[in-house]
Amino acid sequence: MYKRQVYGFFGLVVLVPLVQNIFGVAGNTMLTASVLLGIMILPTIIGVSESAIRAVPTSYYEGSLALGASHERSVFFATLPAARSGILAGVVLGIGRAIGETMAVVMVAGNKARMPQGLLDGVRTMTANIVMEMGYATDLHREALIATAVVLFVFILIINVTFSLLRRKDRA
């Protein structure tokens, strides 16, 4: 739980000033939030992918070498295809984490409740919108926030179903 605040603090202290200095705009932008999310999801994707690659029997790699393939061809055409479903799982977990992330993004994204015109504008994510406004929302406003949550749920459901179909296709 505290990792999110650490990532958010890192974004505020390092990324926001960096964007300010490079682009000459307020550092709380969609670009800053995107870079921070990329930094946040990389450990998840790398960890799961590494486990999947290590789970591939070494005989795949060694057999490819024995047939005359180079190291690179053995890795890219024998080992990685065998680990594909695990790598896809890591990517899906990373995307799910990025979609559900609220607090670190709120800290660096500018929290502006309007449509951004570009990467250097502030933005408010759907999850942040729910968190910020649910406390005082009534009637139609509350229903709109619940609809936002349903949209997020459906989006994650579509990602998971797509992943399941890819895994099923991979096993066939």
Where in this protein do the model-derived segments appear?
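Hydrophobic transmembrane alpha-helices
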Residues: 35-45, 95-99, 109-112, 151-155
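Alpha-helical transmembrane segments of polytopic integral membrane proteins
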Residues: 8-15, 42-46, 105, 158-159
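Loop-to-helix entry region at the N-terminal start of transmembrane alpha-helices
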Residues: 17-44
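C-terminal transmembrane helix and the adjacent membrane-cytosol boundary/short C-terminal tail
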Residues: 50-54, 58, 65, 92, ...
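Small-residue-rich transmembrane alpha-helical segments that form helix-helix packing/gating elements
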Residues: 3-18, 148, 152-155
